[in-house]
Amino acid sequence: MPKLNCHHFEQNRCNSCQWLHKSYTEQLAEKTSDLKRLVSPYLLQSTEFLPAVTSPLAHFRNKAKMVVTGSVERPILGILNDDGTGTDLTDCPLYPQAFTPLFPILKTFIGRAGLVPYNVAKKRGELKYILITQSQHNQSLMIRFVLRSELKRPLVERELPMLLAQLPEKSVVSLNIQPQHSAILEGEQEIFLTEQQVLEERFNQIPLFIRPQGFFQTNPTVASQLYHTAQEWIKERPITQLWDLFCGVGGFGLHCANTLQTNNPNVALTGIEISASAIASATKSAQQLGLQNVKFASLDSAQFALNEQGTTPDLVIVNPPRRGIGKPLAEFINQLGSPYLIYSSCNAETMAKDFASLSHYELKKVQLFDMFPHTAHYEVLTFLVNKII
């Protein structure tokens, strides 16, 4: 398979994609070998190690995080160099092609609204970042201007109609206030400038809602296959109750419950996530799908599991952050005794450590999903079955 050509990488201006010097075939081979090495202690003769799910080489990202440098008349959108200057990355080949005409529109808007780029060395200026996300479902955009203060809000609101006239319908525009002089991407305060406050995405006919500051997969092509695969793995299993821990906006749980409820309307889903805004998104999705017996709650996943002693779901889904689920939750899952476990991970190293603690389970399926081409990172989906079944 070919390599992706990027002049920023070739000229050493941007090294975010550390593996651009490798062909895509090499990248996949290295990732597959890394995953095999990590899970090898848990591979049985009956374990299916499935072929990797590949990504498009370019235009696969649904979001851009642009540091704003330069001047208000000539803003630079891209990354910040060590010397404080900026590199323009508006032609980055990872972004959707719809972003190409958007960047000049945003540069004009910056000038008209007087959003002086923040100068780190001088601690002056207002505009720190522009964060952009696109919905593949309806091409609507979420554009977030990260500002030092609300000083320029009146000017932004004055120029907003001209910006909105050039954006797709159902787009979201907001100001995020980040007053600290530090490399923090966003602050806690979000000011919506549009009535629309969420982007609707759809994977496999399942509506999912993206909110500012919420986590959402950055590679929609691969993410939709990830959720669909989980759905396929469990659809014929005798499952009437499932828990989706670390559920985020509900991607895994909603896909699984939706397919299971077509055969059995009594299937019940409980989704747990510490982020209240993600839970609001998941609840909205369940309502739109018309799913019954679905409950999402904003709690710490480990704490929820420990509180629910005495209840045993047929399926537990875990999709933890990079640190993994940890020993206490793994031991609780052992004691819980659910027949089936789906573990999705963005860090196979911590997942493998968790497998050592999940001693009541054996590994039935493993599949690599190349969510992050041109880097060493990947997503992995696994299916485990209780040994007593």
Curated annotation (Swiss-Prot):
Family annotation (InterPro entries): 23SrRNA_MeTrfase_RlmC, MeTrfase_TrmA_AS, MeTrfase_TrmA_CS, SAM-dependent_MTases_sf, U5_MeTrfase_fam
Reaction(s) catalysed by this chain's protein: uridine(747) in 23S rRNA + S-adenosyl-L-methionine = 5-methyluridine(747) in 23S rRNA + S-adenosyl-L-homocysteine + H(+)
UniProt KW DNA-binding keyword: no
Active-site residues per Swiss-Prot or TrEMBL entry: C346
Transmembrane stretches, start-end: none
Keyword terms of this UniProt record: 4Fe-4S, Iron, Iron-sulfur, Metal-binding, Methyltransferase, rRNA processing, S-adenosyl-L-methionine, Transferase
Xref: SUPFAM superfamilies: S-adenosyl-L-methionine-dependent methyltransferases
EC number, as in UniProt: 2.1.1.189
Residue positions binding [4Fe-4S] cluster: C6, C14, C17, C92
Disulfide bonds: none
Binding site for S-adenosyl-L-methionine: Q217, F246, E273, N319
Matching PROSITE patterns: SAM_MT_RNA_M5U, TRMA_1, TRMA_2
Key word Cell membrane present: no
GO biological process assignments: rRNA base methylation
Tree of life domain: Bacteria
Single GO MF annotation: rRNA (uridine-C5-)-methyltransferase activity
Function: Catalyzes the formation of 5-methyl-uridine at position 747 (m5U747) in 23S rRNA.
HAMAP family xref list: 23SrRNA_methyltr_RlmC
Matches recorded under PANTHER family: RNA M5U METHYLTRANSFERASE (PTHR11061), TRNA (URACIL(54)-C(5))-METHYLTRANSFERASE (PTHR11061:SF30)
Family membership noted in the UniProt record: Belongs to the class I-like SAM-binding methyltransferase superfamily. RNA M5U methyltransferase family. RlmC subfamily.
Name recorded for this polypeptide: 23S rRNA (uracil(747)-C(5))-methyltransferase RlmC
Source organism phylogeny: Bacteria, Pseudomonadati, Pseudomonadota, Gammaproteobacteria, Pasteurellales
Gene that encodes the chain: rlmC
